[in-house]
């Protein structure tokens, strides 16, 4: 029987070997547990049209599963809204929460492959932090990920990506994500 060594994601290795030390020097943390890290990444795809056609949710679930490597949770309406012809319990979106190695691999693919493939991309807005170091942004189409076959797309779907960090301020979160390779616009 051969023993195989578990390979760490390359972004996680870079964080442990380089980024942690530079953040500790930059902000002068006394304790290594104060150094901010990425806690989780939540990828959400809202499909409002699924209220009228329930088959649309399957395409979104399949796309999210291909992109993240994890089966999405189908989100249902919490209450009925007559103007949107929406009833309580109808499927209206899909969500995936990534943690651990899958999270690091997704962030690596996002920063090195997906974001550079966006047409007319000038960088991410540095103003979309929530006040405690978490970052939220949206992608207009799922085809920027190389896992999605462009010829098999039935409809263009966007998604929201929330990067949750253990940072306590926006400056710490911005420094962490910039070190991880997020291309922020310069003001």
UniProtKB/Swiss-Prot annotation:
Q: Which GO terms describe its biological process?
A: translation
Cite the source lineage.
Bacteria, Bacillati, Actinomycetota, Actinomycetes, Mycobacteriales
Indicate the transmembrane segments per the record: none
**Listed Pfam families:** Ribosomal_L5, Ribosomal_L5_C
Its biological purpose is as follows: This is one of the proteins that bind and probably mediate the attachment of the 5S RNA into the large ribosomal subunit, where it forms part of the central protuberance. In the 70S ribosome it contacts protein S13 of the 30S subunit (bridge B1b), connecting the 2 subunits; this bridge is implicated in subunit movement. Contacts the P site tRNA; the 5S rRNA and some of its associated proteins might help stabilize positioning of ribosome-bound tRNAs.
Q: Gene for this protein?
A: rplE
Q: Which GO terms describe its cellular component?
A: ribonucleoprotein complex; ribosome
What the entry lists under InterPro entries is as follows: Ribosomal_uL5, Ribosomal_uL5_bac-type, Ribosomal_uL5_C, Ribosomal_uL5_dom_sf, Ribosomal_uL5_N
Family affiliation: Belongs to the universal ribosomal protein uL5 family.
Note the PANTHER family from the entry: 60S RIBOSOMAL PROTEIN L11-RELATED
Organism listed in the record: Mycobacterium avium (strain 104)
Keyword line: Ribonucleoprotein, Ribosomal protein, RNA-binding, rRNA-binding, tRNA-binding
Record text on subunit structure and interactions: Part of the 50S ribosomal subunit; part of the 5S rRNA/L5/L18/L25 subcomplex. Contacts the 5S rRNA and the P site tRNA. Forms a bridge to the 30S subunit in the 70S ribosome.
The protein's GO terms of the molecular function aspect are: rRNA binding; structural constituent of ribosome; tRNA binding
Name of the protein in its database record: Large ribosomal subunit protein uL5
